[in-house]
Amino acid sequence: MKLHLTGLLLLTLCLSGPIITVDAQERATFLKGPKDATDQYSGLEYGPIDANDTLWRIAERYRQNNNLSVYQVMTAIYELNPNAFENGNLNLLVDGAVLKLPSERYIARIDKQKAQMRAEQDDRAFAEL
C-alpha cells in the first residue's frame, strides 16, 4: 500500500508541475581556443628563431588551410610580430625571437595579391643588401 501511495504521489507531482522546455540556443555549447587566443592570435607560438629559420618555411609548416597562401600567412605573422624582423623586411628574422602565430580568421582577411607583392618587394630589397 505504501509503494502504491508513493507512486501515486509521484504521478500527481509530475502531472501538476509546470512543463519546462529548453530552447536549443540555451543548450548551445561554446568552444574556446587556447587560453591566450584572440581574433588575431591563435594562442600558438613558434621559436626561438635561429639562423636556419625562414619565414617562408615557418608559414608553410603552420598553414593548415590550403585556400590560404603562404604569402598571406607570412604577412599575418609579420603583422603580429613586427619587432621580430629587422628593417621591417620579411626576410630578416631576428635570431632568438618567438613568433606569435595568427588565427586562420586573421590570415584570411589579408589580400593574397597584396601579400605576394609585399613579399616580392622585400625579396628585391633583401637581394640588394
Language model regions located:
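Cell-surface/extracellular proteins and modules involved
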Residues: 1-129
